[in-house]
Amino acid sequence: MVGRGKGKGREHVLLVVFPAQGHISPALQLAFKIVAHSSIDLTFLTSSSAVASILIGLPPTAPALNFAAFSQGNLHNDDDDDDDAKDYMHTLCKHGSQSVRDIIHSTKKGQGQGQGQGQGQGQGQGHPITRILYTTLLPWAADVAREFRLPSVLLWTQPVTTFLTFHYYFTGYEDAINKVRNQQGTEDDSTIQLPRLPLLSSRDLHSFMLPSNPFKGAINTFKEHLEALDAEETPPTILVNSYDALEEEALQAMIPKYKTMGIGPLIPSSVFDTRETTCEVVSLVPDLAQKSKDDCQWHGWLNSKAEGSVIYVSFGSHVKQSKAQTEEIAKGLLASGHPFLWVITSNEEEEGDEIMEQNLVEEIQEKGMMIVPWCAQFQVLKHPSVGCFMTHCGWNSTLESIACGVPMIGFPKMFDQPTISKLIAHVWKVGVRVNAAVDGIVGQEVIKNCIESVMDPDGIGRELNENVRKFMSLGKKAAEEGGSSHNNFKAFLQDMTGGTTTIN
């Protein structure tokens, strides 16, 4: 229940979201929490294609939000097209910032924009925008907020550790980090000890920092984030999709400069439900990568497997493996002797007629293993038969795996994934990490050995399971009433409403 006292006018938040699954998922969770626990109106702004996918996938039971959209342009699937990425970000900034201005103007005039969702139109579309929330990679949203003298809040959708790495890079540690990053691809194993962070080598850094990074201008976006925060007249608020027990040292390091509030994990609350999942469980976060209705065959298949015996393999919606790498993964999985459920997206299949040699496909089929184009990930991770998650180490996937108590095999490729893999394997010790050969391919023996390590009930596997269950419990406690994330979220709501909102 929500109590609201008398005071200032109705609060209307504009939440501006980068149009990618890793940003939309936590942003939607935050949006739902805000409208469910307060009288605050909220407009969710992202690209037109993302809004279309969200509206198709949202169940009627989802809390009502207003949705608005901007054009995002086109980003091709080339992994090394720097010009294409620059054009995309420029288009995003141009159309996105103009949409923010238009919405602010229209709500001032009482002409609400956007599409309602749920039971008819969303409520409060005519109330003026009073605050802007924006996700990672959209620093221009804070600039527009300042144009209108509106407060802005950053929703950081990566680990706090990643934020700090960029912060240090642009505030005196650039030369030291460059010395380490320039060792990429060499035998040198130099590391750097940044304040209150784990030792980092070149293989642990965000890919935007590395010489091999194809998107040369991308790192400037993070510099713009810091500049936008520094431009605030009062200590800026940063909401982070993490929790105190998971990144305690990193969160403490943020305190002197930023008002940082861990409100994670921003995942469906049903993840913490101890009841056995079914295929029909509804998620309030549509998957933008889902291109067809889930036939749920995977659920019956999982039901037929022993507890903790299945390897779940998924590398997210944007990571594509080469044919050579896919074949090594297949051989390693088959050699492990464990049943596996492997998500190979339609994007990967579109790269060519064959994702692997036909004889491997036939062997996988003969042994009764399962390959699917899509499945409801958190429902899979909750299933008792799943004992290991081979993951690209996206932040949402990592938080979901921890919340479900499933240890991981880190298979990072780009962005924040190497840093997250470092945290998984060496800081939290809830998984292991693959090592690639000189040619960049992770061999079948490495994959097989990683599986054996995680699935070993008497060796390292036991320790990994104990650790992941510990952090699962700590995450659940953080989200519960009186927990750190619950209290931070409550404080954030009260800050927005002048202390007039209470959560029971």
UniProtKB/Swiss-Prot annotation:
Residues of the active site: H23
Biased composition (Gly residues): 111-125
Residues at which an anthocyanidin binds: H23
PROSITE patterns xrefs: UDPGT (PS00375)
Binding site for UDP-alpha-D-glucose: T157, Q377, H392, W395, N396, S397, E400, D416, Q417
Reaction(s) the record says it catalyses: an anthocyanidin 3-O-beta-D-glucoside + UDP-alpha-D-glucose = an anthocyanidin 3,5-di-O-beta-D-glucoside + UDP + 2 H(+)
UniProt-annotated stretches for the region Disordered: 107-126
Pfam families from the UniProt entry: UDPGT
Expression sites by tissue: Predominantly expressed in petals and weakly in filaments. Not expressed in leaves, stems and other floral organs.
InterPro entries to which the protein is assigned, alphabetical: UDP_glucos_trans, UDP_glycos_trans_CS
Keywords: Glycosyltransferase, Transferase
Catalytic class of the enzyme: transferase
Pathway(s) it belongs to: Pigment biosynthesis; anthocyanin biosynthesis
UniProt-listed Enzyme Commission number(s): 2.4.1.298
MF (Gene Ontology): hexosyltransferase activity; quercetin 3-O-glucosyltransferase activity; quercetin 7-O-glucosyltransferase activity; UDP-D-glucose:delphinidin 3-O-glucosyl-5-O-caffeoylglucoside -O-beta-D-glucosyltransferase activity
One GO biological process term: pigmentation
Function: Catalyzes the glucosylation at the O-5 position of anthocyanidin 3-glucosides to form anthocyanidin 3,5-di-O-glucosides using UDP-glucose as sugar donor. Anthocyanidin 3,5-di-O-glucosides are molecules that are responsible for pigmentation. Involved in biosynsthesis of accumulate gentiodelphin, a unique polyacylated delphinidin-type anthocyanin, in the petals. Also acts on anthocyanidin 3-O-(6-O-malonylglucoside). Much less active with hydroxycinnamoylglucose derivatives. No activity in the absence of the 3-O-glucoside group.
The name this protein goes by in its record: Anthocyanidin 3-O-glucoside 5-O-glucosyltransferase
Organism, scientific name: Gentiana triflora (Clustered gentian)
